[in-house]
């Protein structure tokens, strides 16, 4: 497998892509799902190849997107792609991205920040295992960009009243 370097992303590109992922999350919420959104971005850093909102507790946006990508694109191409997601990938999603051979992830808010919003909500028992730790246990140099302060408030706004009454102090 190839581990060719990625085309750099500008901060403006990162912010634009995260805002688009947040629109996917907004649509997921409008459908009654949890407000998470993910994009698969082509090696050019601009072209969005796929969008995915959260499906359910087991089919997170990032995992569904990574599995679909692995079925439709060759691994060396996926290594050059970027998975953009509103919240830091959980251990399941990071693992799925790793096995799909998607070489970079960009996320808006940390899993720890998400946990402060979800608290002990039964529908989202959020873990506290940073994706950098998951990737560090593997053999592939997955690039991680995040959190991104410029979009944190926008992403948090979709979650704030979703999990009300279940916050950690």
Regions found by a protein language model. Name each.
Residues 21, 37, 90, 97, ...:
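Residue-level signal for inorganic ion chemistry
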Residues 75-87:
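Immediate flanking context of iron-sulfur cluster ligation sites
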Residues 43-49:
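Short, glycine-anchored, charge-dense loop/turn motifs used at functional sites
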Residues 1-28, 100-169:
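Zinc-dependent deaminase
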Residues 31-35:
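Short, flexible loop/turn motifs enriched in small residues
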Residues 56-68:
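A short, polar/charged loop-to-alpha-helix boundary motif
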Residues 36-42:
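Short beta-strand scaffold segments in enzyme catalytic cores
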Residues 86-104:
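Local cysteine-cluster metal-coordination motifs and their immediate loop/turn environment
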